[in-house]
Amino acid sequence: CYNEEENVREISAALIKQFQECLSEYDYEIVFIDNASTDKTRVYLREMCRENKKVKAIFNIRNFGQNNSPFYGLLQTTGYCSITMSCDFQDPVEMIPKFIKEWENGHTLVMAVKSSSKENKVKYFLRTTYYKLFRKMSTIEPIEHFTGFGLYDRSFVNILRDLNDPIPFMRGIIAEFGYNYSIIEFEQPPRKAGKTHNNIMTLYSIATVSYTHLTLPTNSRV
């Protein structure tokens, strides 16, 4: 997260409630990855960690971006499975029991794919165009409108640990190495509070990383 002072406490409370009410048979921990926030996000995270031992936080020394942070965050997890999501409520916590059900049924990956979105229409159009270009450029079949929100079994996280990729592109890695996966569609709600820090340049940066990933042979990254 980056400058999410209006959301971190609320998303933590929503996650705790979800586990208490729907997944009480599971143990869990909540790990926040902060990308050098300049508002009160870090202050609140430290307070939350002191208040609840199930809440953890990783404080990056600088903003490593929305590609690198989730990847390296997954590498720090130790559970039988891990779920990555944003803290602005655009990734609904209500999806988590659905992920767990698919995982219990034997799926290694469970991916949430946007069937529609209440985000800016221009950005949604650009994302759609990006996936069309992705498909033309690569022999790897992309998972359209998948942002990383989903469940990852420990066996797949171990695959990530074996990769030697300084600039990992999670969506490409999943398309290339993912197996036995399930897709669940959802309508992406609007951000609950605060403002997005993603802009056209962010999307351009992601597209550049994905192009680099696609043009490198697999054995040069492993």
Residue ranges and their predicted role:
Residues 1-120:
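Structured catalytic core of nucleotide-sugar glycosyltransferases
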Residues 212-218:
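Conserved small/polar residues in nucleotide/adenosyl-binding loops
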Residues 60-62, 66-76, 81, 93-168, ...:
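Acceptor/aglycone-binding surface of glycosyltransferases and processive sugar-polymer synthases
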Residues 166, 172-189:
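Catalytic donor-sugar/metal-binding loop of nucleotide-sugar-dependent glycosyltransferases
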